[in-house]
Amino acid sequence: MKRKIVRIGFCMFLTALLLFCYGRYQTLHKPVFAFGQENKCIYLTFDDGPSDSTTPYILDVLREEGVHATFFIIGRQAELRPAIIERIYQSGHALVIHSYSHEYAEIYASPAALLEDIKKCSAVLESILGLETDLYRFPGGSYSLRQELVDCVKKAGYRYVDWNASCRDAEIPGASPDELFRAARDTPADRSRIVLLLHDGAHRQNTVAALKKIIRYYKEQGYEFRTL
């Protein structure tokens, strides 16, 4: 009888320990986003801003449609436009790191150069908003980078996120709003979790013109809009 009680007690202890460890793992290793979950959601992400000619109009559309987005900023541009950065933040959007200079040859010259660029961009956000973030997007994405560059970012404690859909506003010069909409609609290929790449750098008026249609399409498809 005593042995049975001991065995039961040990099993209960082991179960509790496993649950505790699993909970710790979930907390420490929570992904930026996860695919394969049941609810459909979309993350609108804007790179290369802020700009005077695009970002305020993007913000107007987002406000009108009642959705939030994530802005991967260029530090050099943010230094010149702190009021736009403050507006993005006050509107409830996420502000995260893209690059300080966005000069590929310069920032990808070495791991040290890349980290210096990231830290400079982070410092700009902190100086304007008092905001610290560890979320980053490689200019051009991480897909074709040397592994040592990706590794150095992870070792420095930054999380990075790419995208799995794009409106292709940086790929197709002069693309019409309808072309951008079709790309944003078709490239996700029925994914339940969509990280959509758009740009709010200078002279992206067609991106602004396509945005409302993109948002309304995904609302009709039952997607929830989230920030990273």
Q: How would you name each of these model-derived features?
A:
Residues C11, T15, D60, E79, ...:
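Alpha-helix termini
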Residues M1-L44, D60-A69, R191-L228:
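Terminal accessory/targeting
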Residues H102-L197, G201-K219, Y223-E224, L228:
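Catalytic domains of cell-wall/extracellular-matrix polysaccharide-remodeling enzymes
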Residues M12-L18, E38-Y43, I73-E79, L135-S142, ...:
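Short, mixed-charge, low-aromatic patches
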Residues G23-A109, A113, D117-S127, L131-E132, ...:
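Active-site beta->alpha N-cap acidic-glycine motif
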